[in-house]
Amino acid sequence: MSDKDFLNWPFLEDQHRQLAVELEAWCEQTLEQLPLDHSDVDAECRLLVTELGKAGFTANAVPAAWGGNTEKVDVRRLCITRETLGRYSGLADFAFAMQALGSISLSLYGNETLREAYLPKVAAGEYIAAFALSEPDAGSDVAAMRTSARLEGDHYVLNGCKTWISNGGIADYYTVFARTGEGTGSKGISCFIVDADAHGF
């Protein structure tokens, strides 16, 4: 099987094949010209997200209602984007992947106010998203999570420790999972959007 044979798989459509062609051309014309020497990975990630946004590729990470390229987030488009970027630059692949991972919970389950506030900026490559799930004692065993969220008046106060935060330190907002206590195990976990400049963060 050649590097492109997978594009003929029956569950891919012409739009997916066209995406692969367009992204390949972008990688050759734009990505390879960017100043990526890994001397400042944080700045380079932001540059990559900005450039991917200008080209319309970060719009694959959110639904069309908030600036995305398709009605719903299409995992096939995400996979093709990551596979293509990964052949040219692992950092470009990572930068794109975290946009999708850090916003998918919001795309699927967020309220309209939050979706309107964050998703168009993710689609445009203007915001960097982060994903904060793992903890020192709760990595693959997510149900062992200890970070808590307590309702105080009209807002929640989160308390806990996260580790291995994808895009930690450079993100504009964080998708943070915390225990709200409605049930045992994973049934008592909720997702919060936390701005990078939030008090106490």
Language model segments and positions:
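Intrinsic disorder at enzyme termini
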Residues: 1-18
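Residue-level signal for inorganic ion chemistry
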Residues: 16, 111, 192
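Short secondary-structure junction/hinge motifs that connect adjacent elements
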Residues: 28-55, 68-70
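Internal helix-loop-helix
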Residues: 54-126, 167-173
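Hydrophobic, small-residue-rich alpha-helical packing segments that form membrane-like cores
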Residues: 139-141, 156
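A short core secondary-structure module
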Residues: 155, 159-201
